[in-house]
């Protein structure tokens, strides 16, 4: 096992270093072509050669701008982070395969904690200008990426892992990983690809709606990461083990259970993101040049994107069910089809909503619609692959959770309106209350209604909560 892991890691290092080298070369040439005397003051011959190759008109064209030049320099500095994050992901997969989930999950906390420390403490002391502080943050990204990977090494060491070079060339394990990795990446990156395509289309209409939509995507990624991706990460090795032993009844039961937990968490999260979109955006972003108009635009984008939360998360779960069965091509094909549908939906809806000045809403709905088709096609293909899915018991629970989420969402919306009517939202504490108080009450009502309806997921949550309370009392 460890020899195969070492071969994969060695291949990853070779590939990442090759890509990093090419990017370094490309960025250096771009910067040198625009300012050969500045970049090669010690080599005037190189500057003259570059001028002969590119021509003086290109060198004096004014491209790239100062902002683009800063971006290129930061990219050149930060691009080695790609190697760090790839190693961290490989280490996480190795630990997951050995049944360890907490340590790799905390790796992201290590990364974000170091970035926050860099912004708050290191960057202000690095220089007074914004460029110097941005440079400090770029260095912090590299350090945090290395720490995220190194943080997981002690756990791997205890499992018996020791790295040594194993040539990846003509290695059968590396060949299989590469063969399955490319379609696998396209399969699980459906949400990111759809967002990228939608933003590219929206730029041709109005660049401001792209900024509004980007804020909505960032807010969506929090519950999607907490509930969807974390559950999918845990699920893959479990399903893979059941598939390897050909325990397909247990495979279907585990998948059904995971989808039930996903619906339990994501339906209420979707409802709250929809009805509390404006208070949430106001609390997090409304300050400085981000005014009330900006809040309304971003909130509308979030409200249109929020119904797709459970769909985006379900794509991650279902795609990993295929991967556990050794099939990486089907999710890739379905993702490609839905990417094409997303382009059609985006062109149609962005232009339609842009006539009312709300093109960001069209972006959200387009992504939600393509995700719905993605989930439906994945379910259809998986049912054919497994003969049946045994989801009959989940349907009753799903509609009960959907009804409870709608009820809780309506009450949260009314509660937020009443709170703002009495408390306003000019200061931080009223803004915080307009989000947290309705959210807490809605979650409580949602859970109590599902307990009353005897939904299994709510009952299991109650049992888990009681066990934790008993442990604390002891």
Regions found by a protein language model. Give the residues of each.
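Membrane-embedded alpha-helical bundles of multi-pass transporters/translocases
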Residues: 1-474
